[in-house]
Regions:
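Peripheral, non-transmembrane regulatory/ligand-interaction domains of membrane transport proteins
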Residues: 1-149, 155-156, 169-172, 179, ...
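Long amphipathic alpha-helical coiled-coil segments
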Residues: 147-160, 184-196
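Hydrophobic alpha-helical transmembrane segments and their immediately adjacent juxtamembrane loops
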Residues: 168-263
């Protein structure tokens, strides 16, 4: 009873004297739901009785209810457990496909985007989603594996085989999530490297511009002092000669930095 009514539960399997306790968690797929929200499903299963407890509607159970209403649902306890596992694995595979699609879009945007400011929160959100899913994939894999390996007498061989396959499926989903987390980390590293490179390029450009204008400013400063003996001060062509010399100096500095690959 405590396991069925606990407010916060982790996926697990436990054997009791007259049945088994199976606790699973599913992603909340309802409209406007928080994608990080998880719904707990608590099942007490005996030879001829199933007691389920949940605080909110769960798609995996709703599908079974619809099938039973149409007289096409599971006909035994074993079939019910397999149906629950199939529905959960299917829903999680669809959610995982959506996460992969989001990551593909981020990678494509990273390769094309000039502005990467919007990519960082998208990657962070995707990683949080993947971590949340990964947190429950492996425990659910272990729960279904325990049912298949330590199965009660009322679970037949075919159901045990399907439960074992479901355990393997959750294991594959967990491996896929780990691969997604690895890809997301690589994408985040590429984004960080791109941002660092852009910052370095901007700093280098500003430094080169300052290096070009510093000697020009020094020369014009010398020519602007109010003392006698300034060259070309009395010449009508002095302004143009000085401007040409400064322009030539600026071009020479620009060519120097360009040849040194600073530009």
């Amino acid at each position: 009873v405590e396991g069925l009514l606990a407010p916060d539960t982790e996926p697990r399997y436990a054997e009791l004297d007259d049945g088994i306790l199976l606790i699973l968690r599913e992603v909340n797929t309802h409209e406007n739901a928080d994608p990080h929200d998880m719904i707990s499903l608590r099942l007490w299963v005996g030879p001829a009785r199933i007691i389920s407890a949940r605080l909110r509607h769960l798609a995996a159970i709703e599908d079974i209810k619809v099938a039973l209403a149409k007289k096409s649902g599971p006909g035994s306890v074993s079939e019910f457990l397999c149906a629950v596992g199939r529905n959960m694995a299917k829903e999680k595979a669809e959610i995982l496909a959506g996460v992969i699609e989001d990551l593909d879009e981020i990678d494509e945007d990273l390769a094309q985007a000039d502005d990467t400011k919007t990519l960082r929160p998208r990657i962070a959100k995707l990683r949080r989603r993947a971590i949340q899913l990964h947190r429950f994939f492996r425990p659910q894999r272990a729960a279904f594996a325990d049912i298949a390996e330590r199965r009660p007498a009322w679970i037949d061989d075919s159901a045990a085989d399907e439960l074992a396959e479901l355990s393997a499926e959750f294991g594959r989903l967990a491996a896929d999530i780990e691969a997604i987390l690895g890809r997301a980390q690589v994408t985040q590293d590429e984004l960080r490297s791109l941002e660092n490179q852009r910052a370095t390029d901007i700093t280098t450009t500003l430094t080169v511009v300052a290096a070009i204008f510093l000697p020009l400013g020094f020369v014009t400063g010398l020519l602007g002092i109010n003392v006698g003996g300034i060259p070309l001060a009395e010449s009508k062509a002095g302004f143009w000669v000085t401007s040409g010399a400064l322009l030539a100096l600026g071009i020479a500095l620009w060519l120097y930095f360009r040849n040194r690959r600073y530009l």
